[in-house]
């Protein structure tokens, strides 16, 4: 899946679209995607000057965006302006190595389970053979304008 197909599936846009390409997609099971990390990313100006490092929360967001692509494919749906896919939880997030300009971040997501409209995924972000981040992610789809139940 190239960037043209990705922007039809995700509502995110620059500077918050964090998936550049899907290289593997196995329906109802797993996805592998790429985020090419460049020195032009706006967050590098302040994180950290002289030693730029991709913020961990953005690595988690990249994993969540890849999970959204997998979920919409599994549901056989195309998102529209009436529905959004929300990240609702993160468990066990661990950061193992910094992600720097020039790195190619590989985003590997597998579906763990779907229960009561909540999707649970296992996510692994790596650079080459090194794990950069691992986490369990939970997401759900909501209609825009649906009342908040919290």
Curated annotation (Swiss-Prot):
EC identifiers of the protein: 4.2.1.59
GO molecular function, one term: (3R)-hydroxyacyl-[acyl-carrier-protein] dehydratase activity
SUPFAM superfamilies in the cross-refs: Thioesterase/thiol ester dehydrase-isomerase
Enzyme class: lyase
Record-linked Gene3D superfamilies: Hotdog Thioesterase
Subcellular location: Cytoplasm
Key word Manganese present: no
Keywords: Cytoplasm, Lipid A biosynthesis, Lipid biosynthesis, Lipid metabolism, Lyase
Active-site residues annotated for this sequence: 47
GO CC annotation, single: membrane
GO terms, biological process: fatty acid biosynthetic process; lipid A biosynthetic process
Catalysed reaction, written as an equation: a (3R)-hydroxyacyl-[ACP] = a (2E)-enoyl-[ACP] + H2O
Domain of life: Bacteria
UniProt xrefs under NCBIfam families: fabZ, PRK00006.1
Function: Involved in unsaturated fatty acids biosynthesis. Catalyzes the dehydration of short chain beta-hydroxyacyl-ACPs and long chain saturated and unsaturated beta-hydroxyacyl-ACPs.
Sequence similarity: Belongs to the thioester dehydratase family. FabZ subfamily.
Protein's recorded name: 3-hydroxyacyl-[acyl-carrier-protein] dehydratase FabZ
Organism from which the protein derives: Verminephrobacter eiseniae (strain EF01-2)
